[in-house]
Amino acid sequence: MEKTVQKQFVDLLEEHQNIVHKVCRLYTNSQDQHNDLFQEITIQLWKAFPKFRGEAKFSTWMYRVALNTAITLYRKSKRSIQTQDYDSVMFKISSEDYDDTVEQQLKLMYTKIKELNDIEKALVFLYLEDKNYREISDTLGITEVNARVKMNRVKGKLRKLLNP
């Protein structure tokens, strides 16, 4: 590809790499897995970049590619490894002044989110990213109404998981 296309891709990836890192955190349990998934998502983004038409925001398109790649790899790894060690999950919280109680609650919440199915995880992830239902539906390729219904069900499911 041309240097300008390559530079455009690298610039956009650098600008929005936090999206990929957040998806990686949600679907991996170790730094090595995180790095592998980040690399695989980057490869898939590069392969798909010529097809990006700009009809949606780049970040929306990036979410879609990243989530689809993560879900595909997660399903493959789930088939080969049935057990996962949730105690080894480390969450980096990007805010200051969290007391231990808040940190423990966040850790519990993310552990429970990891128990959701792939689509539910993606819904929660996008919801926590403050995406509106239109953006969620565009990213996941579902209708806006379906995104709302699924999100309400997932909220109820998470409530039950967090408060048995």
Predicted regions, residues:
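Short amphipathic alpha helix immediately N-terminal
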Residues: 115-135, 139
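DNA-recognition helix of helix-turn-helix
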Residues: 140-164
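Arg/Lys-rich amphipathic alpha helix in sigma70-family domain 2
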Residues: 51, 64-84, 102, 153
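A short, charge-rich alpha-helical start-of-domain segment used by transcription regulators
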Residues: 1-22, 35
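Structural recognition of an alpha-helix C-terminal capping motif at a helix-to-coil junction
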Residues: 36-43, 47, 56-68
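Amphipathic, Lys/Arg- and hydrophobic-enriched alpha-helical face
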Residues: 13-31, 48, 113
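Internal acidic/polar
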Residues: 80-106, 132-133
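Hydrophobic positions on the alpha-helical face of helix-turn-helix-like DNA-binding modules
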Residues: 41, 65, 123-124, 136-137, ...
